[in-house]
């Protein structure tokens, strides 16, 4: 675990990839957002601000950044994020104790400093802040915890607050969704924070532009997060290169089987659904 900002990949290569994907995707559909996420925390990228600026020069498309918000106490991070149109920080707790239990932050991170960073960013930022709250059963779904979280959100004044739950296999077995009653309670208590409930399964397509091999495309997505088996099948079925470059006898099931037999992906059942994840990931429900 690191808390130091640096360039994990050459920023020029990242920018070229962004430019290429924008050109390909915009040729056949409208792009809603360019979103910076990352295999980890995007604000750890030292060149994030530069990448946002350069992306804005490429196309007039809104830019969003999905972040855990832990580094917003730093002025350089706030300056970088101020160039985005939407910033989506996480805030799963209203108290330091619950924050530590859920997020298990870097040892140097102080909860009050994290919240203060969010508040300072709100005061200076002209874009929209969409806070994401992950509800975990037995940790932050009680009335007391939700009211503590509400008081923090009142200071941050987000444009939207998205409530979600662990819908993919979590890293720890205790990270399970709350009961429906607890979700309803959260919707009610946090209602003044412009709540949007997204506790159902995600929808939408995964972009596979730039890949000439379907198995490489699936691996690239699964490395970021587990995929439901239906998502894997739909993604392979919708690949733009399927009709052009793949043999007539190409089989989606054979692709999945080859990846599994090679040890690159593995199957995991979670909440009565089959997920696929890379063999590198350690999940608490195995």
Regions found by a protein language model. Name each.
Residues 141-286:
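Auxiliary Fe-S-binding modules of radical SAM enzymes
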Residues 13, 17-20, 113, 117, ...:
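Well-ordered alpha-helical segments embedded in enzymatic catalytic cores
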Residues 13-39, 198:
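Short Fe-S-cluster ligation motifs
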Residues 22-28, 122-124, 241:
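Alpha-helix termini
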């Amino acid at each position: 675990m690191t808390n130091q900002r640096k360039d994990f990949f050459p920023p020029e290569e990242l920018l070229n990839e962004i430019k290429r994907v924008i050109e390909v995707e915009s040729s056949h559909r409208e792009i809603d957002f360019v979103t910076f996420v990352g295999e980890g925390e995007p604000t750890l990228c030292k060149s994030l601000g530069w990448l946002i600026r350069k992306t804005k020069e490429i196309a007039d498309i809104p830019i969003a950044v999905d972040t855990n918000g832990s580094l917003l106490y730093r002025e350089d991070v706030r300056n970088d994020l101020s160039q985005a149109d939407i910033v989506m920080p996480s805030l799963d707790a209203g108290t330091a104790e619950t924050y530590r239990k859920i997020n298990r932050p870097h040892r140097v991170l102080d909860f009050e400093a994290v919240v203060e960073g969010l508040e300072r960013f709100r005061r200076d930022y002209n874009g929209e802040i969409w806070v994401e709250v992950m509800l975990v059963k037995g940790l932050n779904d009680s009335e007391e915890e939700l009211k503590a979280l509400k008081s923090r959100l009142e200071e941050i004044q987000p444009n939207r607050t998205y409530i979600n739950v662990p819908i993919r296999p979590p890293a720890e077995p205790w990270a399970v969704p709350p009961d429906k009653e607890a979700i309803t309670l959260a919707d009610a208590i946090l209602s003044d924070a412009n709540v949007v409930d997204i506790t159902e399964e995600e929808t939408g397509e995964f972009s596979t532009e730039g890949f000439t091999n379907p198995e490489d495309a699936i691996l690239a997505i699964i490395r970021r997060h587990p995929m439901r088996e239906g998502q894997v099948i739909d993604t392979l079925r919708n690949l733009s290169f399927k009709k052009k470059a793949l043999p007539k006898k190409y089989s989606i099931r054979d692709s999945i089987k080859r990846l599994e037999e090679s040890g690159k992906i593995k199957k995991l059942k979670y909440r009565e659904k089959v997920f696929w994840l890379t063999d590198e990931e350690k999940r608490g429900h195995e």
